[in-house]
Each structure stands twice: as C-alpha cells, then as structure tokens.
From Swiss-Prot:
Entry superkingdom: Bacteria
Biological classification of the source: Bacteria, Pseudomonadati, Pseudomonadota, Betaproteobacteria, Neisseriales
GO biological process: translation
Gene3D superfamilies according to UniProt: 3.30.1320.10
GO molecular function: structural constituent of ribosome
HAMAP family in the record: Ribosomal_bS16 (MF_00385)
Full protein name: Small ribosomal subunit protein bS16
Keyword field: Ribonucleoprotein, Ribosomal protein
Cysteines paired by S-S bonds: none
A Pfam family of this chain: Ribosomal_S16
Coiled coil (UniProt feature): none
Length: 81
C-alpha cells in the first residue's frame, strides 16, 4: 500500500519533517517514492512552516495513496491559510 507520511530529518532537538510518498513497508526515514513537501515545527516568523505540492498530493491520493493523520492535519492547515 502507498502512504503519504512524515519522514524525520534535522538534528537533535531541531526536528524537520519531509512529507513523502512511500510504500507502507518502508522504514520511516527509509526509501521513498517522491517528496511532496516539508513541515518545520520549530520555524520562526521569518521561516516557512509548511509547504506542500497540492498537485502531486492530489495525484497520489487519486492513485489510492493513504494519508497519515499527521499529514492530513497539515493539509487542512495549509488549506485554511
């Protein structure tokens, strides 16, 4: 099954997440099919907090990809902004 979920990056105490499309059997930070955005939970006012490629997200969702709960919240947050 193909899923859209977060892969952690960054350093200790400075998390940074990539929004990726991957096979559900792959590890959290392992192999992925495509990177469709990012989420920076510790962004300040000058930095971008969330960026998602809506075209590619819609493409993968139409192909049957399942969206994780955390990514669904980010999509909802970006649509509201």
């Amino acid at each position: 099954m193909v899923v859209i979920r977060l892969a952690r990056g960054g350093s200790k105490h400075r998390p940074f997440y990539n929004v990726i499309v991957t096979d559900s059997r792959s590890r959290r930070d392992g192999r992925f099919i495509e990177r469709v955005g990012f989420y920076n939970p510790v962004a300040n006012e000058k930095q971008e907090r969330v960026r998602l490629n809506a075209d590619r997200l819609n493409h993968w969702i139409a192909q049957g990809a399942q969206v994780s709960d955390s990514v669904a919240k980010l999509i909802k947050e970006q649509k509201a902004a």
